[in-house]
UniProtKB/Swiss-Prot annotation:
Residues 253-272 dip into the membrane without crossing it. The lineage of its organism: Eukaryota, Viridiplantae, Streptophyta, Embryophyta, Tracheophyta. The keyword Ion transport applies. A nucleoside 3',5'-cyclic phosphate binds at residues 381-500. Its main location: membrane. Belongs to the potassium channel family. Plant (TC 1.A.1.4) subfamily. Residues 1-67, 117-138, 191-204, 298-502 are cytoplasmic. One of its GO terms (cellular component) is monoatomic ion channel complex. It is a multi-pass membrane protein. InterPro entries: cNMP-bd_dom (IPR000595), cNMP-bd_dom_sf (IPR018490), Ion_trans_dom (IPR005821), K_chnl_volt-dep_EAG/ELK/ERG (IPR003938), KAT/AKT (IPR045319), RmlC-like_jellyroll (IPR014710). This is Potassium channel KAT3. It comes from Oryza sativa subsp. japonica.
C-alpha cells in the first residue's frame, strides 16, 4: 500500500488521544479523614479519638486558618529579614513595630503548640497526653522556634543607641527558620488532589529561585556597604555615592546583579572589585550550579511525565504502520489496528478498570449495580431471573470499548466470552457464496455470542462494530459458574434461550 495512504490514517487516531491532566483539577472534594490518622485495629476501632480539655485538634478548621495566616507572616519574614540585614543600618520605626507584632504572633503559636496533639509516627494514633506533647516539642523544634522569635533588635538597643550592631543582625536572621512552615505547606499541597501538581511544583521552584536571588543580592550589597573603601566595591565603581541614593535604587541594583549572575548573563557592568566580593561571587556561582541542576531536573521530570504517553503512543502507531506496510496487509486490517491502538490509549488514560480493581469487592458490586444492572436485566436471556443472579453477573462483567470496524466475534469461532452491547452499533455479518453480507444490525442491550458460549459450538455469524461501542464482557467460565450456583435461574435462562431460537 502506498505510504501516502498510510499517512492519511494518522488524523483518525490522534484526535481521539487526549494527554491532558486528569488528576487534581477534576476533583472537588478530598478524603474526609485527616492526614496520617488511622483507626486502631480491633473492637476499639469505632471509638473516635477523644481530646482532653483545653487541647486543640490539629484538624480543626480554625487551626488550619491559623496555620495559613502564619504562612503569610513567614513570607513577609523571608523578604524583610535579608533586607533589614543588608540595607537598613538604622532600623526605621515602622518595620520595627511590624517585626515585633509578627514576633508576637509566632510567640502565641509557640504557646499554642503545647496544646496541639500530634500523630505518632509508629502507631499513627493521635497523642493527646499534655506531658507527651510538651516533651516532644521541647526535644525537637522548641529551641529553634524561640530563637527565631526573640526580638534581638530590641535587645540590641540596650547595648547600642541605634541598634545596628552586626552581631545582633546575624541573630535576627534566625527568623528564616520559619521557612520550614512553607516547605511543609508545599509538601501538603503536592499531595492534595484539589490542586494541580504541576502548578504547585512550578510555584515552589519559582519561590526557591526568587528567595535565592533576594538573599544573594542583599548579602552582596552588605559586603559592599561594610567595605572600608566604597569606591572599590561592585556598586561603588558605577555609583560612587550609592549610600546617598534611595533604598529602591540600591535594592533594584542589587537584584539586577543577582539575576544576571544567576542566569550567567554577565553583562560586565557590575562585577567584583575586591577580594571579599570575589570570594562571595565564587560561592554564589557554585551555589548557582546546584540550583540550576535542581531546577532543570525538576522541570525535565514534569515535562517528561506530561509527554511520555504521547511519545509512547506515536511509537506504537508508527510500529503498527510499519508492520502493516512490511507484511502488505489490506487497508481495512491496518485501519482496524490503528483504531484499536488509538482507542486503547484513550481508555488507558481514563484508567476505569484500574480504578475499579483497587476497590473492595462490595464497592465494585455497588458501582456495577448502579451502572449496568438495568442493562443486563433487560437482556432477553435474563428475563425472569432473580435480582441476586443479576447482581452476581454484573459484578463479574467488564466494560470495554471497541473501535469502529473492529471484529468482536468471528464466524465459525468458538467464543470464550459473552458480550452485551450497551451503546454503539454492531453489524451481524454472514458469509454466503464467498461474500460478506449484513444479516442485520444488533440493537443496544442485545447479547452477542450467547449460543456459542452456552451451547459450546462455533458461532454462526461475525459481529463487527460500525461505530465506537461500549460492550460488557463476561467469560464463559464465570458465567457457567454463576449458573451452577443458581440452578433455578439456570433453568429460566435455558428456557429463554430455547424460546428465542426455536
Amino acid at each position: 500500500m502506498p505510504r501516502s495512504s498510510r499517512m492519511n490514517l494518522w488524523p483518525h487516531c490522534f484526535p481521539c488521544f487526549d494527554d491532558g491532566d486528569r488528576s487534581g483539577n477534576r476533583f472537588s472534594t478530598v478524603c474526609n479523614f485527616p492526614d496520617d490518622l488511622l483507626p486502631s485495629l480491633g473492637a476499639t476501632a469505632h471509638q473516635p479519638p477523644k481530646l482532653r480539655k483545653y487541647l486543640v485538634s490539629p484538624y480543626d478548621p480554625r487551626y488550619k486558618v491559623w496555620e495559613t495566616f502564619l504562612i503569610i507572616l513567614v513570607v513577609y519574614s523571608a523578604w524583610i529579614c535579608p533586607l533589614e540585614f543588608a540595607f537598613l543600618r538604622y532600623l526605621p520605626s515602622a518595620p520595627f513595630v511590624v517585626d515585633d507584632v509578627v514576633n508576637g504572633f509566632f510567640a502565641v503559636d509557640i504557646m499554642l503548640t503545647f496544646f496541639v496533639p500530634f500523630v505518632d509516627k509508629k502507631s499513627y494514633l493521635l497523642v493527646n497526653d499534655p506531658k507527651k506533647i510538651a516533651v516532644r516539642y521541647l526535644s525537637s523544634w522548641f529551641v529553634f522556634d524561640v530563637c527565631s522569635t526573640v526580638p534581638f533588635h530590641s535587645i540590641s538597643l540596650l547595648f547600642n543607641e541605634h541598634g545596628h550592631d552586626l552581631g545582633f543582625k546575624f541573630l535576627n536572621v534566625l527568623r528564616l527558620w520559619r521557612l520550614r512552615r512553607v516547605s511543609s505547606m508545599f509538601a501538603r499541597l503536592e499531595k492534595d488532589i484539589r490542586f494541580n501538581y504541576a502548578v504547585i511544583r512550578c510555584t515552589k521552584l519559582i519561590s526557591v529561585t526568587l528567595f535565592a536571588i533576594h538573599c544573594a543580592g542583599c548579602i552582596n550589597y552588605l559586603i559592599a556597604d561594610r567595605y572600608p573603601d566604597p569606591r572599590r566595591t561592585w556598586i561603588g565603581a558605577v555609583m560612587p555615592n550609592f549610600r546617598e541614593d534611595g533604598l529602591w535604587i540600591r535594592y533594584v541594583t542589587a537584584m539586577y546583579w543577582s539575576i544576571t549572575t544567576l542566569t550567567t548573563t554577565g553583562y560586565g557592568d557590575l562585577h567584583a572589585e575586591n577580594a571579599r566580593e570575589m570570594l562571595f561571587g565564587i560561592c554564589y556561582m557554585l551555589f548557582n550550579l546546584w540550583l540550576t541542576a535542581y531546577l532543570i531536573g525538576n522541570m525535565t521530570n514534569l515535562v517528561v511525565h506530561s509527554t511520555s504517553r504521547t511519545r509512547d503512543f506515536r511509537d506504537v502507531v508508527q510500529a503498527a504502520s510499519e508492520f502493516a506496510a512490511r507484511n502488505q496487509l489490506p487497508q481495512q486490517i491496518e485501519e482496524q489496528m490503528l483504531n484499536h491502538i488509538c482507542l486503547r490509549y484513550k481508555t488507558d488514560g481514563l484508567k476505569q478498570q484500574e480504578t475499579l480493581d483497587v476497590l473492595p469487592k462490595a464497592m465494585r458490586s455497588s458501582i456495577s449495580h448502579y451502572l449496568f444492572f438495568r442493562v443486563v436485566q433487560g437482556a432477553y436471556l435474563f428475563k425472569g431471573v432473580s435480582s441476586r443472579f443479576i447482581q452476581q453477573l454484573v459484578t463479574e462483567m467488564q466494560a470495554e470499548y471497541f473501535a469502529p470496524k473492529e471484529d468482536i466475534i468471528l464466524q465459525n469461532d468458538s467464543p470464550s466470552d459473552l458480550y452485551l452491547l450497551v451503546s454503539g452499533a454492531v453489524d451481524i455479518l454472514v458469509f454466503l457464496d464467498g461474500t460478506e453480507q449484513v444479516y442485520r444490525r444488533a440493537a443496544e442491550g442485545e447479547l452477542l455470542g450467547e449460543i456459542g458460549v452456552l451451547c459450546n459450538k462455533p458461532q454462526s455469524f461475525t459481529f463487527r462494530t460500525t461505530k465506537l461501542s461500549q460492550i460488557l464482557r463476561i467469560s464463559r467460565t464465570k458465567l457457567l459458574g454463576i449458573i451452577q450456583e443458581n440452578r433455578e435461574d439456570g433453568d429460566i435462562i435455558r428456557s429463554n434461550l430455547q424460546q428465542v431460537n426455536v
